[in-house]
Amino acid sequence: MLAWIRAGALAALLLGGVLAAAGGAEARTVRWAASGDPNTLDPHSQNVGTVTMVLQQIYEGLVTRNPDLSPAPGLATSWSQEEPTRWRFNLRQGVRFHGGEPFTAEDVVFSFARAQQPTSNFGIFVDTIDHAVAVDERTVDIVTKVPDPILPNKIISVYMMSKPWSEAHNATRPQNTRAREETHTVRNTNGTGPYRLAVREPDVRTVMARNDAWWGWQGQQGEQPPGNVTEIVYRPIASDATRIAALLSGEVDFVLDPPLQDLNRLRSASGVKVLEGPEVRTLYIVFDVGRDELLYSDVKGRNPFKDLRVRQALYQAIDIQAIHRTTMRGQSVVTGSLIPEQVNGYVREEDVRLPYDQARARALLAEAGYPNGFQVTLDCPNNRYINDEQICQAITAMWARVGVRTSLRSQPIAPFFAQIQRDDTSVYLLGWGVPTLDALYSFQSLLASRDGGPGDGIWNFGRYSNQRMDELIARMKTETGPARQAAIREALKLYREDVPHVPLHHQMIPWAMRTNLTIPHAANNQPYFRWAVMN
């Protein structure tokens, strides 16, 4: 494994030297590794972290983020709410796509329309948008169906694409991943961001070279000074041991997901440092509460998860403190809430777990008609979240103690996400980040009924549906101030009462890197190499 890392790194360094010579800057290559690889490079297809962590180096939205995740001007230099349902964005001038095409107002109109198409997984960010209109070459208005007080925050995740380039490559709609569609945008990009795609070999390496024409290199992107990295070489390395060996030997500079059991060794290792902080991400166990009969269970003719007592039983059978202490080695924040504390709308009084109580769990199962338990299959990724497979292994053992015999089906993120997006699951582990830093994003994506508006229930593969919850989510979309917070608070209470999920914990995210690399640690677990400095 290390041999091919060496060979790839040498090739990348040679490529970086050529690029740096052409751009007049000293070559600074960062070799980056994590366990998983993006399953697409289409900027409007898959709203998952393994995709966005790469694409944010290449593409940009009208609004971007500072290192502290606060909104900042991106391809729009300013914006204002002209009317309750009309936002105006003033576009940055002189910007070109990596292919040479000028960035125009028509590209903005096209990009928002593309993100609204049925094959897009980004409907949650554009659900209130009726249409975008080019006022003139430098101005775009976004007209919403209803007042949307957090629109600028939501569209940070909507990246701008070149309309002519998309049309030329028959890519005017997002890739349909459910149909396993292969399009030009799966392996090719054309953004305006700080880095452009140089090499894409799925599951092997992705090389991104500095875009010397990027506007932000002139220090125009907030208070954080720009970095000096001229090239990024990303390699998925599934093996924890190999990934850490590569870092310790100096063959990798940055590891996004070091295993928790290696942190103490990394902290004391020469030439290596560890950055740590809380992530805006919560892990849950999600039940299929929609089907009349589970796909993967020995219970026939009914769905045990439709019974609140069964969901409560499996919740109370989980010793979350044991998972925190042993599986996560203290690197988690135990929660009873849908959202973490950093998210707008969080209510501490609603962050209360059902107590761990195996006797109560057995009693609830018996009351529900399952005195001897039942069998079910738990779906779990094995390379997406910190210790994801180990968490699922611990839970299956805990459920077995109350009579629920659980088969664990763990797999890499690409087939795992494809499976749950086909509704081919009975119960599964999900981690959910909140890029908007607002509670609506989680409620609308995970708990809104799937027959609602655009973006509603887009990740609600448990098919939870509650009319009152839908009403509260509708209020969150349009109301402001105390009325909006009251809706969020009631929804958090209803979430606790209905138990559509078992909330587990918020992740703590360690990053491991060589000491000659400096990069701001981000709570969304997304490395921004535009601010990285390599010495």
PLM ranges: what are they?
Residues 33-83, 113, 190:
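N-terminal lobe/hinge region of extracytoplasmic solute-binding protein
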Residues 46, 278-296, 301, 415-477, ...:
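Acidic-aromatic pocket-rim loops
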Residues 70, 158-233, 358-359, 363:
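Gly/Pro-rich hinge or "lid" segments in bacterial periplasmic/extracellular proteins
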Residues 80, 124-174, 194-201:
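Surface-exposed binding/hinge segments that line
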Residues 88, 309-312, 316, 324, ...:
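Extracytoplasmic/peripheral linker and loop segments enriched in polar/acidic and small residues
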Residues 183, 213-265, 308, 396, ...:
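Ligand-site clamp/hinge motif
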Residues 195-196, 316, 333-367, 384-389:
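Structural transition elements
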Residues 511-535:
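Long beta-strand-rich cores associated with HINT superfamily self-processing modules
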